[in-house]
Amino acid sequence: MKIINILFCISLLLLNSCNSNDNDTLKNNAQQTKSRKKRDLSQEELPQQEKITLTSDEEKMFTSLINVFKYTIEKLNNEIQGCMNGNKSKCNDFFDWLSEDIQKQKELAGAFTKVYNFLKSKAQNETFDTYIKGAIDCKKNTPQDCNKNNKYGDGDNLIEQYFRGVANDMSNRNSNEEIYQYLKDELLKEDNHYAGLTANWQN
């Protein structure tokens, strides 16, 4: 009888320990299921990040901004300190870098609005890009004729001075991020280069 009692106690202990493991496993499974549900719910609650895109006006303005600065750097590189002696890549690499970041493009297009609208009002029957490129070409090819009819400013080629001046200051920055920040800030300013651009016009 003693042996039966011992066997009975051992079997109870054995069953209890097996049941204990099952309880722990069930508890772990339940906790994992709860944490998965919480994680799934929290992921569902996160708003889908909207893809940033440019409006047609922003795209037009950004494209003009890039075209005008690239054209200025190409035509007047020997008058832009950081682009002299064949070092145009430093100046142009920024635009390649910028092509990857829609948010920065959007911000620059917005910052360029004031300059764009001012110069567009002076362009008369020409497109914006044609008008600005004409001012750059005049400086490059026939500087003595740039003041005729005050087309690019009263008594001076203010358009060329503006874009060359900003490009020159851009080229003195050390990184693409610094160039971006400078350009954005400069486009928003009402003094400095912008004041020089807008100061002397007859029409």
UniProtKB/Swiss-Prot annotation:
Residue positions of covalent lipid attachment, annotated as N-palmitoyl cysteine: 18
Membrane topology of this protein: Lipid-anchor
Region (Disordered): 26-47
Signal sequence, start to end: 1-17
Lipidation (S-diacylglycerol cysteine): 18
Keyword flag Membrane: yes
Record Pfam families: Mlp (PF03304)
GO CC, any one term: cell outer membrane
Induction remark: Weakly induced when grown at 35 degrees Celsius.
InterPro entries, sorted: Mlp (IPR004983)
Endoplasmic reticulum keyword on record: no
Keywords linked to the UniProt accession: Cell outer membrane, Lipoprotein, Membrane, Palmitate, Plasmid, Signal
Protein localization: Cell outer membrane
Taxonomy, superkingdom: Bacteria
Role according to the record: An outer membrane protein that may participate in pathogenesis. Some human Lyme disease patients have antibodies against this protein. The Mlp proteins probably undergo intragenic recombination, generating new alleles.
Recorded family membership: Belongs to the Multicopy lipoprotein (Mlp) family.
Protein name: Lipoprotein MlpJ
Native species: Borreliella burgdorferi (strain ATCC 35210 / DSM 4680 / CIP 102532 / B31)
